[in-house]
Amino acid sequence: VVDDHTVQGKNPQGTVISLFDYWVDEQNSVDFSPNPSLNSGINKNRDLKFNKGQGDGFNGWTGGKTPYSGMVEKTLNSNGYPNLATSWTNGIFYASPLDYLFNENDSTTGGSAKVEGKKAYTNVGGLMQVDDEGYYYYDSTKNFASYDSASNGVKLYDKAGVSYRGTLGQFFPFNSGSDVFTESEGALSAKPGVTADSNNVNHWFGASMSTHFLHPEGGKTTRNQDITYEFSGDDDVWVFIDDVLVGDLGGIHDAASLKIN
């Protein structure tokens, strides 16, 4: 019944969206256990550690909306993925690529390319919508998104789901609509007690989006307004254009935003 309350998503031409599920014990185990292993699964022998924000440096919560800038190099590596920046501040003194987080290899891959604690879902459809000005967007404060393995697409619900400190509308694509909603009198309601801190919410995941676009001369829309690109998220949001870092919201932090004009 909950799935009756969905809206149609769009698939922008030339855009590839992928989702990645990460874990340290088992894929369906609780993320926020009191003492999660910091050296198993996706964390094994890695500098970046999935945890509850209690780590050091970029593995620790910044304490608010302030990102941990300078966490990755200013250009993508030769494989097209970020590298952790080598610096005394980061405590990284050697090449530390993040390919393993965002490539197609996962726990089902054979041989040395296998990545423990990860399942990759590539070319996922249906996440985006189009606003009145022709911009493609996804906004978790308007629509809860849930990955559907049967279609390799996203179910977009007509209501935001999961609250954090009183604000409704979080992005947890590996939770189902029935995990976060109840239905009553033909409408969805947020399920009581399901918050961003709940143990039954899948916190450890990644998403990537690559797109080919042309920026028109003068940088204006058909309405003669500046073309802008806006991003908002918590925990490690990086934006690269032509392999160059142009937006840096790295680190474990509350939701922060950036705008590129």
Task: Describe every region a protein language model picked out.
Residues 1-261:
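Acidic/polar, compositionally biased interaction segments
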